Amino acid sequence: MDVQTLMAASAGAVASRLLCHPIDTITVHKQTIGKFSFKTMPLKAYYRGLPISLTLITPATCLYLSTYVEAKRRFKPSVGEGAILYSICGMTAEVVSSFVWTPLEVIKARTQISQKGSVINTISTLARSEGLKGFYRGYWMGVAIYLPTTVSWWVCYEESKKYLQKQSNWDISVIAPICSALGTVVATTISTPLDIVKTRYQVATSSAMRKAEYGLQAEKELGILEIAKLLFSKHGVKGFTRGLFTRMCYIMPSGMISMSVFESFKSKDID
């Protein structure tokens, strides 16, 4: 993986985060507290958690994409081009990058629903109350969620990219966002129910979440199954689709921007 590829991945990650972070904040509010109002939420609140996102999103995205590219280079001679290769590479990239993504998601989600909205306060409170394991809260669930999500996304993306490259003379900067959007629709629909449970589990011990959702039960540690049962009992099936459209509105442009920039710079290296 050369420097140009890493710079391209970084540029795409930063650009997509700056443009799409407010939508992500709205999604987290809907998935956790369940309350959101444009009238009562100040403008700066939409960017809660942005500093930590920008700090970690770049190395996390670079790690994810570089792992995928390297895995593709190593496995392609023995596996061949196709869905199996994309699945293996996607899973490898997800498992490796989740070591960075999980703490980011925990800190970001807690900061976004916090009244103070301070990253430093979120980190210090989490470290003091839960220690290191608090930052990796929901790691294995995240891996379980994002493995099928990653596989479905990369298979849709790569297969549709091959098809469009054969059937059209479009530039990769046009093909990449189209294929990314298609992969996002499929992957997001598959992953949203479990992602909601994961997000609620990651912020379950925060004061904002306890006050909004769990009441007296907040004093005890809530497991993943308990959170899922509480969600179903209070909101029914639709509770597991909360923020689906908003989440898709965030992930889709974010992925389109990232992949368009990345592919424009490094499409020859990937292929």
UniProtKB/Swiss-Prot annotation:
Solcar repeats: 3-74, 81-163, 171-268
InterPro entries: Mitochondrial_sb/sol_carrier (IPR018108), Mt_carrier_dom_sf (IPR023395)
Membrane topology: Multi-pass membrane protein
Organism: Schizosaccharomyces pombe (strain 972 / ATCC 24843) (Fission yeast)
Family as reported in the entry's similarity comment: Belongs to the mitochondrial carrier (TC 2.A.29) family.
GO molecular function per UniProt: iron ion transmembrane transporter activity
Keywords of the record: Membrane, Mitochondrion, Mitochondrion inner membrane, Repeat, Transmembrane, Transmembrane helix, Transport
GO BP terms in the entry: iron import into the mitochondrion
Membrane-spanning ranges: 5-26, 49-69, 84-104, 138-158, 170-190, 240-261
Transport recorded as keyword: yes
GO terms for cellular component: mitochondrial inner membrane; mitochondrion
Subcellular location: Mitochondrion inner membrane
Main location (coarse class): mitochondrion
Protein name, as recorded: Uncharacterized mitochondrial carrier C4G8.08
Source organism, top-level taxon: Eukaryota
